[in-house]
Amino acid sequence: MIPKIIWQTYKTNAPPKRAANNIKSWTTHNPNHKYRYSSDLQCEAFIRDYFDKEFIKMYNSLPIGVMKADVWRAAIIYQFGGIYADLDTECRGPASLWIGEDDSLVVTVENKSGAIGNYIFAAIPKHPAIYSVLESFIEIYQSDTFLNKRSPTPVQDFGAHGWSIGILKYYGLNKPEIMEQGGEAYNKYAKVILDRVRFYTSESKILSAYPNENTLVYHQTASVFWLEGYESWRLEQERQLGVFGV
């Protein structure tokens, strides 16, 4: 059974005001779940307490906060299990509507390429597929492309790209399968939310899907649409462009 814990994070001890209603939506719709919020300092302490020196070195070397947050979310769910949700996700119904008693891993597909999204997911502790994701982060960190700062998409490498690499590797899937079958290829192994209305994100609009009364999770894509009182990771990435020479 996936533990009834909701995990969220932001750089400071206090989340941005724009996230207040979203946080409330998760606790209101899931009163039987524990809620856990971690600042950057708390995330760093967790990584330091639970992982080995190589993993800590990788984590500390990441130059942009969102990259560390991407690693932390996989690490915290691997260690304790539960639900991870970005602060810019609104919960519109109980998690029990999309997490079954026998589920061990629940993920969603971001787009037609079959990339696994990491803005929301749920798993039991020590799930081997999540461990594979953590291994993929180490492999990316140790690659010549990353070490020589030649990656054109360093943030994505530790986001949906790295996440998908780990999941694909664990389940023995490959890109041609995913391109042909989309998210259906994953359903042999884990519950995958494919309905872009039930799990709505900004990309869904491009695919002519819109949120309605059946939408359970609404990803508001803060890095694009939130402005006042919220600093997008995209701005931090712009300040750090020289780090990767892109």
For the regions a protein language model found, what residue spans apply to each?
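Glycosyltransferase-associated regions of secretory-pathway enzymes
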Residues: 1-69, 85-246
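Small-residue hinge/turn detector
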Residues: 70-82
